[in-house]
């Protein structure tokens, strides 16, 4: 139950990275590291500690696939997304899921590369979370889809978004809300997360950018936003009930997150855009800050953290309305939740 700081450290390019996850205690002492198993390397998109003291992490792996059925080559190099659950104490892989075993390549929105030898990042897994029933929520930027996955079998229980042939929900907008286009809520999205009672939140990038796709891939909706969706499993309806637009009207080609605070506010990290913001439930912008030029953050969180006294605890304190920037993760206890009452910028 002790509070910990977690982060990923490694190398990589274009969102595909290889490295190690670290766990430090409140005295800033290393207490554990987590590595991927089965010959893979941990990617920096996610490191989630579960109530069972296991870690949910992501990895990427390459394979060769026959894509002739979708107009591609017979020997295309592809990049598949992998989820692993790791026993933190032993390093053992307890469970593994590979996107290619469950999702057809035809579901990708990512253009095929010019050469079969150029890896096609068709899925781009970027988040894994726990739903309230203990099953997993997996997000894939390049299929414009979020998946609920059975934690034991790996089967997809339902999917939200993506191509109509496999989307399990009728997508509508509440009064005053605007869809990306008919039947589409998000594009190139990140950070699919359950808020309980059928409420789910996303960071809706609406752009992948030339650097990610090789083409101008800006989607129909003209700016990035944080969105909230209500799922009705009985009627198979997904309703866009709330959205917070990027204050400067910009689109983030990569990264980003949305966090619901205990007070009901929404903290948004704008990813590759050098901003982070906090909104009241009624949409009022409470806080908007900008990093120096050339700096961006994968995610930004408002989290309590009580630093140790002495040299290790230096750093300016701020009022709780100021989000706590963390390079991918933050001050959390071993269940992935915050547990202190002191707020800082890091």
Segments predicted by a language model, with ranges:
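Histidine-/acidic-rich catalytic cores in large beta-rich domains
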Residues: 1-312
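Ser/Thr/Gly/Pro-rich low-complexity, disordered linker/stalk segments of secreted
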Residues: 311-346
